[in-house]
Amino acid sequence: MGNKGYSDNDILSLIESSIKQGNADIEKFHENLLSNLNKIDKIKNIKAIIEKKLSEKNIYFIRHAESEHNVLEAKYAYDEFEKWNIQDPKLTKKGIEQTKSASEKLKNFNIHFDTVFVSPLTRAIQTYFLIEKDLNNDAKIIVTDFIKEVVNSQLDKNKGKKLSLLKEEYKNTKLDFQYMTKEIWWYNLGKEIDKESEGQTNFLLRLGIFILWMAFRPEKNILLISHSHVFVNMQESFGIRNADVVKMNNNDLVKKVNWMINYSD
């Protein structure tokens, strides 16, 4: 596509090699990614390419089922966050029950998924395992912190388990952690400091990079199992209920990745 003979696979390799570098500071990541795209003369027409590629994909989103912090958040005021601020909360009994309706919706969609992307937070991983039986056996299951919940230094609910613990706990499952290389992955990318919240700009940058990654991957049918803020900031939407299954609007995804490409501080 580019006048230097770079293929889509070359672009995909570029993106994935960046993702595997250990999730360096997201702004530097973004700067380097666009610099590399410019070097291979793709940036001039990449927006049209991305729009075409995303138009060929069916992308579905499941928000994790109800978890312990959802119940407590509804009970206590935000300024009482110490009463509901549970680190890496698990699903409630109601949440476990909710996944049955998610499974039914998946059956009704009747989609053969090529790849499932899962947030590394426990509530998302649990949701995956509860619907796993209703997914086709040959789907790739990729765990990535690029679709973790937005990082706020005060909120323990979005701090998870160390990567080594995740790999050990799920070593006999289909979960693939190859794109996660950082032991402490739940802080602002590249800044392992409790005082460092992610901020909206960095959050949108990582989501835009993730959408770019999806666009250049070969899979057609994709499922994301993630969080409410991820959905709202990928789509022109006010929200999504726990365990709901939604087909994503690809035009909204194009807008988000275009914002990432155009962003300059």
Question: Where would I find each of the regions flagged by the language model?
Answer:
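Residue-level signal for well-ordered alpha-helical positions
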Residues: 130-131, 169, 237-238
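Phosphate-handling substructures
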Residues: 68-90, 133-208, 259
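Conserved anionic group-binding/transfer micro-motifs
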Residues: 95, 99, 116, 166, ...
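Active-site-proximal alpha-helix that buttresses catalytic centers in soluble enzyme cores
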Residues: 5-139, 143, 152, 244
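A short, well-structured juxtamembrane/interface segment
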Residues: 99-105, 203-210
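Active-site-adjacent alpha-helix immediately C-terminal to a catalytic or transition-state-stabilizing loop
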Residues: 125, 205-263
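Residues at the C-termini of beta-strands that transition into short coil/loop
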Residues: 63, 145-147, 249
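Universal eukaryotic N-terminal targeting presequences
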Residues: 1-4, 48, 264-265
